Amino acid sequence: MAVLECEGLRKAYTGFELGELDLSLTEGRVLGLLGPNGSGKTTLIKLINGLIRPDGGRVAVCGLEPGPASRSLVSYMPERMQLPDWMRVGGLVRFYEDFYRDFEPQRARKLLSSLGVDEGLRVKQLSRGLRQKTQLVLAMSRRARLYLLDEPFGGVDPASRDYILETIMAGRAEGSALLISTHLISDAEGLLDDVLFLSEGKALLSGEAEQLRRERGMSIDALFREVFRC
């Protein structure tokens, strides 16, 4: 079953256009949304989550157009910090428990502890890396149908990335799908079932990760560097 479908999706800003994008993501799959800064990755994620309206085309989550019903099925981790500075981490867990019916507080507390995040600290007392870990834990502690993670490894020390990868893989609800936007491709490559390369709002390359590795004779990370000449 398709958890996410985009057909001819368009969004234009001054000097930029996300154009005629087609995408399908089915249950159990992880899609890597890959591209340089300014390629349209965050714009696409916001369209999927219903935070901005498309100028054309269609997007659906489990057959639902963006709106309150579809957003209840989506767990979204934005690239930029969205947590209020004055709240304590434990308070955030209680807030999510009250706000989301599918949130699992015991799981969140266990993950926070294993990642070294003190629930008694206020958000403003956390380092950038600890804030990122907290956002990720909150997102992955929901039993969502679709997880949208925008640069989940930003600000996280390399030593913690393997554990975070394990958290992402183990935390997904059964029957869910995951879309992950990242520029740290070598770290995330083991997660990815499918990839979509974006450049200036256009899809340059897409397909199953394993098939692309076989056809091109290189890793997805190496292919990314070749396509974008990094």
Locate each region found by the language model:
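Helix N-cap at the start of a conserved alpha-helix in ABC-type nucleotide-binding domains
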Residues: P158-S160
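Catalytic Walker B motif of ABC-type/P-loop ATPase nucleotide-binding domains
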Residues: Y147-E151
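The feature captures the beta-strand-to-loop junction immediately N-terminal to the Walker
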Residues: L34-P36
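ABC-family P-loop ATPase nucleotide-binding domains
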Residues: E79-T134
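Conserved ABC transporter NBD signature motif
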Residues: G56-S70
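Conserved beta-strand
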Residues: C6-L9, F16-T26, G57
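Helix-to-loop junction immediately C-terminal to a conserved catalytic motif
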Residues: N49
